[in-house]
C-alpha cells in the first residue's frame, strides 16, 4: 500500500477587492445670520394748523 503524499504548497494571495461605495451626502448647513436692519420710513405728514389768536 502506497503512503499518503505530502499536501501541496499554499496558493498565491487572491486579488484585492473592489473599492467601497461612496458615503452619503453631508447634512445641509445651518441658516445664515440675520440680515441688516431696513431703512427708516419717510417723514410723516405735516400736522394741522393751530387756531388763530385774535
Curated annotation (Swiss-Prot):
Entry's transmembrane regions: none
Listed Pfam families: Collagen
Organism annotation: Frog virus 3 (isolate Goorha) (FV-3)
Protein name stated in the entry: Putative collagen-like domain-containing protein 065L
Biased composition (Low complexity): 42-54
Annotated ranges, domain Collagen-like: 7-51
Annotated segments matching region Disordered: 1-54
Top-rank lineage group of the source organism: Viruses
